[in-house]
């Protein structure tokens, strides 16, 4: 079967790809979210604080996920996206498994860096691949279906983590009697890491690479030197990329000024919070990204103009991350909130919160994409109306209701409402960003979009 027929818009291979990519995203968030349900045991075992857990859940993961996502996006724009997704899935699953061998805060941090690097390959590639497989008219719905894996994975991660943790700790109160001397939280990391490696083999053989730009009739030839292009994108994150410019001295001066401003900001935030690791990592990540934007303006003028000169793109990159800014913090500390305020066990939280997260968010993300596409047929800003209604109004009601409700059951109901609202924006936001750029730069734009979500939502 020819590649053209394999990549028929909305056809058989498109549906297979969408189904498998949902599974990939489920594993993406199982491996990411499981840390929150294991947090209390990890804190006790490794002797670390809430700030350290916040660093592991947010900054350690978020900075690497965000920054490495840019060259990964470039690789997805110039190489085989199916291969990149499969390799990335195998790598982050291995890093999750190795997290179960961690004996210190440092080693666990390194493995979380690895998870972030591996996962950075997934969504930019998936956004680009699915945009070629399906018509722009249903793009928000398709990307919402893909993004539902995020919430299903988060829910399953809580459930599996809690179940493995409680079962293991009950079976082996003395961990020295457990297989390989593993503790419950270590067994949980290993238990969710292995299946992802198996899934990577399936995605490699069953997802077909579509013709780039086919769904819009803007067929783009693949790059002849994809790895060289990606290496240039890596170099673009550093000031070295500015030395080859005609006005290199001026560029270096501007770059140094940006670096100084970022340093002053991070130093002030460190003095305010006392969290050296978080603001050091965030500052380095922000500096690398600002350097990349500066170098992109010289290396790829068209991409720079579409991503950073158009008002729609700028507003998108600033506004959309404000929703996960609340959401990631909410998700990271929800288990601890119910343990400390409502006396719930890890297994109870894993079951109830896991189901609430999975079901509520699935309803929100699919509904958001569907109604976004329908409203877009009638109003130019239809998808944005959906984002505001769900991502702002419903989210605020659910968040404050959960925190201030005195009854556990009422709090859980508001938690459900929160997850419906907070997931509405995902497909509509991703579609808005991918529609603003050309097919050849879709993955890179998607990577920068995810970067803004992560650097503002996760790392902050």
Language-model regions: role of each:
Residues 78-89, 373-390:
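Cytoplasmic membrane-interface "Motif A"-like loop-to-helix N-cap segments
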Residues 67-106:
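Conserved MFS/SLC helix-loop-helix module at the cytosolic interface between two early adjacent transmembrane helices
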Residues 183-205, 278-285, 395:
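Symmetry-related core transmembrane helices of the 12-TM Major Facilitator Superfamily/SLC fold
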Residues 380-429:
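C-terminal transmembrane helical hairpin of 12-TM major facilitator-type secondary transporters
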Residues 35-36, 248-281, 311-358, 365, ...:
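Extracytoplasmic gate region of multi-pass secondary transporters
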Residues 56-74, 127, 355-368:
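Central cavity-lining transmembrane alpha-helices of secondary-active solute carriers
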Residues 47, 80, 101-107, 118, ...:
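Helix-breaking motifs and short loop linkers at transmembrane-helix boundaries and internal kinks
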Residues 38-67:
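Extracellular/periplasmic helix-loop-helix junction of adjacent transmembrane segments
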